[in-house]
Amino acid sequence: MLEDNRDLLQHPRRNLGARYRSQARKFVKLATHDETRFHDNIGWAEQSARQAILYDFTDEDNWRCLADIKIILSDYDGLVAVLEDLFSILGRDPEQIAQLKEVNFQQFGLELLEAALARDPLNPDTWWKQVNSAGDSIESLEGFVERCQRLDFSDPRANIVFGRRIERIRDSGHTKLFIELAQNLLAHRPQNHELWLELGRLYERMNKSDEAWLCYDHVQSLRPNTNVRDDFLARLTGKMDGLASEPWSRPTVAKRQEFLDQMVSLARRVSTVEDVEISKQSVESESESRSIRLEKLLEQGDFLSLIHI
């Protein structure tokens, strides 16, 4: 039950997110018009904005709402925390924020937020249109695939965001690429029942009954109240009725073990981190190089490049 409640919060619920964001903005207006109750109202505004993100982290306006409140409160450490959280969902290294510690977040914090969302939209349809029209400053499909192979998707929110992105890749006809990327995401977070379900449906359309059954079986083990495995078996049995061929039987224990071994092997591969020894001199040189580049980008106002330093 606890796991079910946690998953409910991790899956976007747009209506609740929009409701809390609207409530947060109302409290912000009250705070700006009544100085005597400013702290009370702005406190409620911040709490509501946090709830908006909690219920729907895929709505960019929810992030903007909380960031605006952090600016009003002059809570720049809090703004950094918001950006770190967003970067985690976008599959980017939160330590990139630490590399920007010299940035004046009072002046450039909101611009950095917009730059991150402009380059990596949370809406999967917007992201897919952007990939298809990729220019020099926008990530291509090849770049996205390369990035997926080296990022950590253990954050369930990142797993959901990227899972919906690769669904757009599947819908465009790249089925083999979808399977590869889906297995990578599931290796990071096997509890993503939505992605298991989509993978099972794809295998079913490809007439790969064993693989489809294994995926549906995993979904039903994660969500016992669903009947996707049983429904699939009923559909499969219905197709077999009246045919001379031998009826389909469930995958053998060996087949199931092979499937699980593949996922374990992939999980080990994606979680392996190479230990690289870096000399003190090279660290200082890299830090100095970043500082020089940071100053140039700030002078040019190039915020899109800032998030990739």
Task: Enumerate the language-model features and the residues they cover.
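Intrinsically disordered, low-complexity, charge-biased linker/tail regions
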Residues: 1-32, 36-37, 81-177, 217-305
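Non-membrane alpha-helical segments in proteins
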Residues: 60-72, 202
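Conserved small/polar residues in nucleotide/adenosyl-binding loops
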Residues: 307-309
